[in-house]
Amino acid sequence: MTKAEFLRWESDDNYVYEFNDGILEPTTGMRQDENYLFSTLENTFFQTASFRSGSRLRPEMDFWVTDKQMRRADVSYFTSQQIQQMNTGQKAIPGFVVEFASHTDNDVVSITKRHEYFEAGVQVVWWVYPLHQEVHVYTSPKIVTICTDNDILSAAPALPELKMTVAELFRK
């Protein structure tokens, strides 16, 4: 499938698709049991100056990591300037993304996505493991901080004012 065909195509099944150099890659979208994680993250974000200035967290927003590759992180952070650019048809790369790991994920795909994100310009990736209530915070493909319990999660340098503990993220 060409990129142009993909852009016109609409899925008729229950998958969300990413595009990788002509290949459609089915992924699962954010599940209902992950909604509380997004809501907690979003509610914390609502308290920031970035939110008040028009920046936004977007669930399942597509973005092109290369001219041939489109990804959809579970959550992406776009500045108000990036949102204005997108509104005029320009492409934007989020500075911060969150992926909620599921039992269907495999390490090869996860590692590949992290590398793609950083190569595209993403500054921070949170890989959230709900089953273990653990978050891996990447600031590069090689630098990771594993957080649990009352460890502080930070979206710095992309969004330094967004901070919360792992326990707060997982509180229902």
Indicate residue ranges for each PLM-predicted region.
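Gly/Pro/Ser/Thr-rich low-complexity, intrinsically disordered segments predominantly at protein N-termini
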Residues: M1-K172
